Amino acid sequence: MGKITFYEDRGFQGRHYECSSDCPNLQPYFSRCNSIRVDSGCWMLYERPNYQGHQYFLRRGDYPDYQQWLGFSDSIRSCCLIPQTSSHRLRLYEREDHKGLMVELSEDCSCIQDRFHLSEVRSVHVLEGCWVLYEMPNYLGRQYLLRPQEYRRYHDWGAMDAKAGSLRRVVDLY
């Protein structure tokens, strides 16, 4: 079970809302979100209701302002608790529909380009565990939650282009 608390103001001030499960619409509980405390679990936050818009991956910890979670604004409108698994494995493909060069990962990768010489990823097959794909190296830029399934093209995971800089397994480190 997870627990996350959203605060309207920076530094854990102002009106707040505590959540322990997926919530497709947070709008009734707060108008803006400027700080977050994650007490347990790993969470994906979304800037719009129904798990749409920019995504932000948060692990246990304190985030005193939205820049701490690489947020573009103070808009958080939905969230989901990411299930934990003991093993992680996925395949990246250079072309759509799982074609072209394929590489398999079971560990975090801070720079896909340096490690595999892939500047773009056009399809993904997540075999085990949940992952976060970042558009830039070193876990920066836009973030995309990848669950166990086949993603035949980058639009399937919500991306506007095939940029893929780094990958991180969803693991609660505590």
UniProtKB/Swiss-Prot annotation:
The modification S-methylcysteine is found at residue 23. Keywords: Eye lens protein, Methylation, Repeat. One of its GO terms (biological process) is lens development in camera-type eye. Coiled coil: none annotated. It comes from the Eukaryota. Residues 84-87 are annotated as: Connecting peptide. SUPFAM superfamilies: gamma-Crystallin-like. InterPro entries: Beta/Gamma-Crystallin, Beta/gamma_crystallin, G_crystallin-like. Residues 2-40, 41-83, 88-128, 129-171 form the Beta/gamma crystallin 'Greek key' domain. GO terms for molecular function: structural constituent of eye lens. Crystallins are the dominant structural components of the vertebrate eye lens. Belongs to the beta/gamma-crystallin family. Monomer. Has a two-domain beta-structure, folded into four very similar Greek key motifs. This is Gamma-crystallin C. It comes from Canis lupus familiaris.
